[in-house]
């Protein structure tokens, strides 16, 4: 934490508040869409994919707006306000019925668009400001001599790792909020949380038929046995009441997201004057160059942008595999993991927990290698991260093959007793998230650092937006995960992601020497 720009922690705290609010919603989004509107896993996954992609695509728009207006701080401020308004819309508990679904689902999607657009204005531009902090930090160090400059340049990667840890502190706590509020509200109304029951309730409302599986799960959730024996209208009323209470508890959790946005806004406004303005610095730096120097700089800028786009093309495959934590991996936790007393959303807290614990260890390892003259370049670290991500899916593929897991659709067609004998222990998820988190720490914060190194000074917001845009492209195809999860044996599903990560690693390793040359 020592020897970094003074504004780093303030920016990280503002980002932490925003991420806390976001991860409250993100932890339950796919399951919420399915439980509220009775959507299939594939349809819920498709909405999630477009929302998640929108967050990062709109970061590109936010970067362009900030670069054009030269108003990074104002753009960030507006983003926080728009996100808060989106969460306000989501927090209103309206029971979804066949009559109002035609306008309620689009309203929910509009609220998600507001959150995505606000995030686009906020996310990349705050990262651009952090990058400018280190540009200024290195410029000041250069005035003190080569040794001071070398030491300052070595701080950038670790600075972005610190920034990343604060993001995940919010992500660690947030996944507990919605499940706790939902379970509390169910208990207040005489019900018990049951992850399978919302889907079964929607099936009854739509088809009017019951199964032994439905009756068993309804009894576990606190349904009156007399109601279950009456059938027809009585069971329909139970289903409506359970869905209403179940989803209202999630709606109330979005109020916490609104509060988190307001706290983030207060932190940002309190420290606004301390943050640098990237475009103004770039304009003053370019004022004294000759025509020849500007031509040479233009050639270098082209090389840097080529390098940036090359890395962006590779990391698309990583984000497609990694962000299955909100898609097929959450569904896997719900269906194939024995989590009777733990909501499946809670497992998303495992990743930020590992980020917080492992980041200091990885920073120490990189620092120790640097002191011995064996420093690993940022592009090579990213390539290694791809290989580590492949290890996570190799583990899942082997485990699923050994267990003989069918597709999720076939699994749900089995008797409850047979399902119970096939369910895995929680350690499977913990091991998977461990490998994915180590991979993330080799790629995400170091990718931000890489972008800040190669980005032209007058395009900082745009380039950070491009990095997030690559994430968006990967997120656009997240729906592939639930599709394969429901249609293919699980070993085959995980093997697809394994091959993606291995391919990305191979391509990245093939470009390492060129990328190292460009970044130097």
Residue ranges with predicted function:
Residues 68-83, 368-387:
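Cytoplasmic membrane-interface "Motif A"-like loop-to-helix N-cap segments
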Residues 16, 86, 100-125, 312, ...:
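Hydrophobic core of transmembrane alpha-helices in multi-pass small-molecule transporters
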Residues 46-68, 172-174, 349-366:
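Central cavity-lining transmembrane alpha-helices of secondary-active solute carriers
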Residues 81-102, 386-418:
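C-terminal ends and interior cores of transmembrane alpha-helices
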Residues 27, 60-61, 92, 169-184, ...:
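A gly/Pro-rich, aromatic-decorated transmembrane alpha-helix motif that marks the paired
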Residues 25-43, 183, 325-347:
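Short amphipathic helix-loop junctions that connect adjacent transmembrane helices
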Residues 2-36, 113, 302-328, 349, ...:
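Pair of pore-lining "gating" transmembrane helices in MFS-fold secondary transporters
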Residues 1-6, 135-140, 147-157, 166, ...:
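Intracellular loop-helix junctions on the cytosolic face of multi-pass helical membrane proteins
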């Amino acid at each position: 934490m020592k020897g970094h720009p003074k504004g780093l922690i303030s920016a990280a705290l503002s980002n932490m508040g925003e991420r806390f609010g976001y991860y409250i919603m993100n932890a339950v989004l796919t399951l919420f869409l399915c439980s509220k509107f009775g959507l299939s896993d594939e349809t819920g996954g498709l909405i999630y994919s477009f929302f998640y992609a929108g967050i990062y695509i709109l970061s590109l728009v936010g970067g362009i707006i900030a670069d054009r207006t030269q108003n990074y701080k104002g753009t960030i401020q507006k983003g926080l306000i728009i996100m808060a308004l989106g969460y306000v819309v989501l927090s209103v508990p309206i029971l979804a019925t066949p009559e109002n679904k035609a306008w309620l689902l689009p309203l929910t999607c509009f609220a998600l668009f507001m959150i995505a657009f606000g995030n686009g204005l906020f996310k990349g531009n705050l990262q651009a400001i952090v990058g400018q902090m280190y540009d200024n930090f290195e410029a000041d160090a250069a005035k003190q001599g080569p040794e001071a400059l070398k030491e300052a340049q070595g701080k950038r990667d670790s600075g972005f790792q610190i920034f990343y840890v604060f993001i995940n502190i919010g992500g660690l706590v947030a996944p507990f909020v919605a499940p706790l509020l939902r379970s509390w509200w169910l208990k207040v109304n005489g019900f018990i949380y049951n992850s399978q029951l919302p889907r079964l309730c929607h099936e009854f409302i739509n088809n009017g038929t019951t199964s032994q599986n439905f009756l068993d799960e309804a009894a576990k959730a606190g349904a009156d046995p007399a109601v279950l024996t009456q059938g027809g209208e009585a069971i329909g009323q139970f289903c409506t009441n359970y869905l209403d209470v179940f989803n209202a508890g999630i709606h109330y959790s979005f109020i916490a997201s609104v509060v988190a946005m307001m706290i983030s806004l207060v932190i940002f406004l309190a420290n606004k004057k301390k943050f640098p303005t990237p475009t103004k610095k770039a304009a003053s730096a370019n004022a004294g160059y000759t025509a020849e120097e500007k031509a040479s700089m233009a050639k270098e800028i082209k090389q840097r942008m080529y390098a940036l786009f090359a890395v962006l093309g590779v990391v698309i495959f990583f984000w497609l595999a990694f962000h299955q934590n909100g898609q097929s991996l959450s569904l896997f936790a719900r269906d194939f993991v024995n989590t009777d007393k733990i909501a499946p959303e809670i497992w998303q807290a495992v990743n930020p927990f590992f980020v917080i614990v492992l980041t200091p260890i990885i920073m120490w390892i990189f620092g120790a290698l640097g002191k011995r003259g064996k420093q690993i370049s940022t592009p090579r670290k990213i390539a290694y991260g791809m290989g580590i991500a492949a290890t996570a899916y190799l583990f899942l593929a082997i485990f699923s093959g050994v267990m003989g897991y069918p597709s999720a659709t076939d699994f749900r067609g089995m008797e409850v007793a047979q399902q119970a004998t096939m369910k895995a222990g929680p350690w499977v998820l913990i091991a998977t998230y461990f490998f994915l988190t180590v991979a993330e720490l080799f790629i995400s914060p170091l990718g931000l650092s890489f972008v800040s190194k190669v980005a032209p000074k007058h395009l900082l917001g745009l380039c950070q937006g491009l990095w997030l845009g690559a994430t968006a492209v990967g997120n656009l195809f997240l729906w592939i995960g639930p599709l394969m999860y429901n249609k293919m044996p699980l070993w085959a599903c995980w093997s697809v992601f394994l091959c993606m990560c291995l391919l990305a690693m191979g391509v990245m390793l093939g470009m390492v020497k060129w990328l190292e040359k460009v970044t130097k």
